[in-house]
């Protein structure tokens, strides 16, 4: 049986894991799984359908039949490109509220594991190393101070032409962190054996280089 390499990069919102994962995947020629986008897609689809964030059964059914396609920096839901829409703060907050439900997470598990294909996979999220790919040869837990993360998220949104208030972002991040850490379903924590990387004072290039160095060492 062929073993497909997986690098998991977990961490809190706006820790830089998505950017680092994308660049690591590019450097290695690996596939990329943005698991957070899946929850955002469920959030968007359920919002459009008028489904409440506590309607767990309906949310889980929507997650199980999610019609999603990923491309370089792009994502489609039922044939409609929603790359920018799912990055709205309101959708992110809704996704965070939906992600606490175990049936929703279970519905997305098989879909996420299906991304594990040759030549390899870089998977970013919150439970990639703890739940989805616990056998990954390299697990990274990326973090940064909440202030650094708020500044990054503010810049990301402004660069995309989306209005933002840094005080509101800071408060939202603190609320999401608390929700992610304390939820019963797959709480945010470093996986066993994970390498921890604080990117508060690091450039993206430095973080990517460190992950690639670790991967070379564990292969």
Curated annotation (Swiss-Prot):
Any idea which GO molecular function terms this record carries?
ATP binding; CMP kinase activity; dCMP kinase activity
Q: Which reaction does it catalyse?
A: CMP + ATP = CDP + ADP; dCMP + ATP = dCDP + ADP
Entry GO CC: cytosol
Q: What is its main location?
A: cytoplasm
Q: Which PANTHER family match?
A: CYTIDYLATE KINASE, CYTIDYLATE KINASE/PANTOATE-BETA-ALANINE LIGASE
Matches recorded under NCBIfam families: cmk (TIGR00017)
Instruction: State what protein this is by name.
Output: Cytidylate kinase
- Please give the organism: Cupriavidus metallidurans (strain ATCC 43123 / DSM 2839 / NBRC 102507 / CH34)
- Write the gene name: cmk
